[in-house]
Amino acid sequence: MSWQAYVDDHLMCDIDGNRLTAAAILGQDGSVWSQSASFPAFKPEEIAAILKDFDQPGTLAPTGLFLGGTKYMVIQGEPGAVIRGKKGSGGITIKKTSQALLIGIYDEPVTPGQCNIVVERLGDYLIEQGL
């Protein structure tokens, strides 16, 4: 299966008649493996800051998580495994695997829990596959 199919079929999937706003799979070097057409252009330093928070949990909390110039307030995640952020009625979930970052961005009517399930389920599967 191609990386684009993982984004299209597993991250941008139907969720009770809705879907994520945007999604991507990135390498831990910040390279784009695959992304939805709606995924925002991001800066390398934004990905570097996200990776730093996975290595040193809590580093994003004081400043917020930035992706594509959008600031998200960091909310409870799973240290070293999942970072979650909130902005208004939407937010972001980032799951780290051994080789990649899976990113899902949502807005109402998709709920934070629905985004978490979609992103983390695929991340867990990729971890089981050694990716």
UniProtKB/Swiss-Prot annotation:
Gene3D superfamilies: Dynein light chain 2a, cytoplasmic (3.30.450.30). It is found in: Cytoplasm, Cytoskeleton. Disulfide bonds: none annotated. GO terms for molecular function: actin monomer binding. GO terms for cellular component: cell cortex; cytoskeleton. Belongs to the profilin family. Occurs in many kinds of cells as a complex with monomeric actin in a 1:1 ratio. PANTHER family: PROFILIN (PTHR11604:SF59). Binds to actin and affects the structure of the cytoskeleton. At high concentrations, profilin prevents the polymerization of actin, whereas it enhances it at low concentrations. By binding to PIP2, it inhibits the formation of IP3 and DG. This is Profilin-3. The lineage of its organism: Eukaryota, Viridiplantae, Streptophyta, Embryophyta, Tracheophyta.
